[in-house]
Amino acid sequence: MTPNRRSTDSYNMLGASFDFDPDFSLLSNKTHKNKNPKPPVKLLPYRHGSNTTSSDLDNYIFNSGSGSSDDETPPPAAPIFISLEEVLLNGLLIDFAIDPSGVKFLEANYPLDSEDQIRKAVFEKLTESTTLFVGLCHSRNGNFIVQKLVELATPAEQRELLRQMIDGGLLVMCKDKFACRVVQLALQKFDHSNVFQLIQELSTFDLAAMCTDQISIHVIQRVVKQLPVDMWTFFVHFLSSGDSLMAVCQDKYGCRLVQQVIDRLAENPKLPCFKFRIQLLHSLMTCIVRNCYRLSSNEFANYVIQYVIKSSGIMEMYRDTIIDKCLLRNLLSMSQDKYASHVIEGAFLFAPPALLHEMMEEIFSGYVKDVELNRDALDILLFHQYGNYVVQQMISICTAALIGKEERQLPPAILLLYSGWYEKMKQRVLQHASRLERFSSGKKIIDSVMRHGVPTAAAINAQAAPSLMELTAQFDAMFPSFLAR
């Protein structure tokens, strides 16, 4: 009794059958057995003896010979020159397409002229069956000749290729590491109408699944990077939903994609479409701010909040909103979280002066002191495994301002604020020095407050007070007529 076999589409060429698995993941070559099998075809570049400067891609040699035993050396085979037309006539096109060297030959010899009859024959052969076309897309080697078709396709050929992609399972192609290259190139090379149809098809898929898949996310990234924003507004609307945003941001691939979307929407305010992009950006950022606390505490989503806080330009308003609405009044708890503590560090570093003042004051005096343990927020953070990094950042900010590492020149009144914060932290560190020395983080904190060259409040006041010569110059400028007498 004949065993049951999976039904497959086969192509018979020169005594060989090419069977495609139903998932189109690979293309297998099954040759009929014979007593003297022909060895694999080896493709070698050939240079004509009379013209050593000609391109290696102009001609190729196929070396073939009869089978021989291991102890025999086969006679040298005569070179056989073959053209693309002969490949077609001999039914070897698919053989070449799935062979590493053969596909290079096809790419190099695929005619550029859209009216060339051989080119039309190659295109028709490779697209005559959806099963064959999709099988090549999923093939390690075959995808390269399909990319060549996509790159040089006329509008009519683009429509045919698009039909093949959709009929063959576009979502499956997006999730395959070879076929996804074909889809990405189509997004880049097809004309507007065909790309629009391709985007319309993509918009019907499970976007959350695509954004969290390490292969298909490259297709979405190509959409965001290459195409006009008005072609992927559907994706921004998708992200602007709380559940969708959390699903994408909490993924190690998706969190980077959200940053790229923000970057694209906020870029180049001088372009005419900026007003439209700002509306989309505001919709997305409203959702991010609303979910800021949850995002900050996630292993991957916290990078999105950090990215917003570190951004400049139009994003500064959203940075300030996040600090004001989400971080303030939660600094102590978030500083003790493994991932949110990174967000707090960034907020201290990039906060504008007014918000930085509020953050510092919250740490120093914003929480009720634990009377039984005699500890306040600063004491807790000094000895916490994550909170100590926040304290180190606070010390670093004050030190940079006091020794003149700030980009802008700070007035004496502001410097006195930094000096006051620095002295509070220094006194507290010295008070707990014996305990802090037990930990490597504690030793770093002690070293940071014992640095030389940090001016005190008295030194800042002395520097701010005008000297006798400065007072004289000011007096002369105010009363020039007095000196003329």
UniProtKB/Swiss-Prot annotation:
Residues 439-454 are annotated as: RNA-binding. Residues 29-48, 55-76 are annotated as: Disordered. Residues 55-68 have a biased composition (Polar residues). Pfam families: PUF (PF00806). One of its GO terms (biological process) is post-transcriptional regulation of gene expression. Keywords: Cell cycle, Cell division, Developmental protein, Differentiation, Oogenesis, Repeat, RNA-binding, Translation regulation. GO terms for molecular function: mRNA 3'-UTR binding. GO terms for cellular component: cytoplasm; nucleus. Disruption phenotype: Simultaneous knockdown of puf-6 and puf-7 results in ectopic primordial germ cells (PGCs) outside the somatic gonads, premature PGC proliferation in L1 larvae and germ cell death. Does not affect germline development in adult hermaphrodites. Disruption with puf-5 and puf-7 results in abnormally small oocytes, disorganization of oocyte nuclei and cells, inefficient yolk uptake by oocytes, embryonic arrest with impaired eggshell formation and cytokinesis defects, impaired repression of glp-1 in late oogenesis, and mislocalization of rme-2 to the cytoplasm instead of the plasma membrane. The keyword Cell cycle applies. Pumilio repeats lie at residues 86-124, 125-163, 164-200, 201-236, 237-279, 287-324, 326-361, 372-411. Puf-6 and puf-7 are >98% identical on both nucleotide and protein sequence level. Experimental approaches often do not distinguish between the two genes, which are collectively referred to as puf6/7 and are considered to be functionally redundant. RNA-binding protein that binds to the consensus sequence 5'-CUCUGUAUCUUGU-3' in mRNA 3'-UTRs and modulates mRNA expression and stability. Functions redundantly with puf-5 and puf-7 in oocyte formation and organization, early embryonic cell divisions, and repression of expression of glp-1 and other maternal mRNAs in late oogenesis. This is Pumilio domain-containing protein 6. It comes from Caenorhabditis elegans.
